């Protein structure tokens, strides 16, 4: 085998080529690192945006659950409002009928039976949370009363309900029918 010996000129040329390759490699490595860092920053920003979006969606969902729960509670609380509203005219008619003065024994018996039915109806409504609105002698409140007449009466102060023409009712804390009243001027 023959060995080729490199001349110092060839060795210098090889070293120069190696240095050039190494410099190119370092330059490429720095460019790659810069590109990688940009990509990392871009992905981090995207990740942060997605995390924020997830947090907003979670908050929206929690708000939705709270609203839905509140709506269900409200529906359950006032579920009987429609039925109660339909029964109020019948209750008014019972009260008018009970105000009649019986003139014979048969009418008295009928009136007693009606009083029992009336009490049962009032008790059933009370169990559902229905209560009459107090009106006579109270200060007029447009949230509870509907003024249909104004009168002048020295026995009452100004803006006081003098007479109740039709009873008003509340279901729990909601007015289902305001009292129709006469108000003192």
Curated annotation (Swiss-Prot):
Q: Which gene encodes it?
A: grpE
Keywords, comma-separated and alphabetical: Chaperone, Cytoplasm, Stress response
* Any Gene Ontology biological process: protein folding
Q: Which CDD domains match?
A: GrpE
The reply to whether Cytoplasm figures as a keyword in the UniProt entry is: yes
Database matches in HAMAP family: GrpE
UniProt family annotation: Belongs to the GrpE family.
Please describe what this protein does.
Participates actively in the response to hyperosmotic and heat shock by preventing the aggregation of stress-denatured proteins, in association with DnaK and GrpE. It is the nucleotide exchange factor for DnaK and may function as a thermosensor. Unfolded proteins bind initially to DnaJ; upon interaction with the DnaJ-bound protein, DnaK hydrolyzes its bound ATP, resulting in the formation of a stable complex. GrpE releases ADP from DnaK; ATP binding to DnaK triggers the release of the substrate protein, thus completing the reaction cycle.
Q: Where in the cell is it found?
A: Cytoplasm
Q: Which GO terms describe its molecular function?
A: adenyl-nucleotide exchange factor activity; protein homodimerization activity; protein-folding chaperone binding; unfolded protein binding
Question: What protein does this entry describe?
Answer: Protein GrpE
User: Which Pfam family, any one of them, does this sequence belong to?
Assistant: GrpE
Q: Subunit arrangement? A: Homodimer.
Which residue stretches belong to region Disordered?
Answer: 1-37
Q: Which GO terms describe its cellular component?
A: cytoplasm
Q: What is its main location?
A: cytoplasm
The record, for InterPro entries, names:
GrpE (IPR000740), GrpE_coiled_coil (IPR013805), GrpE_head (IPR009012)
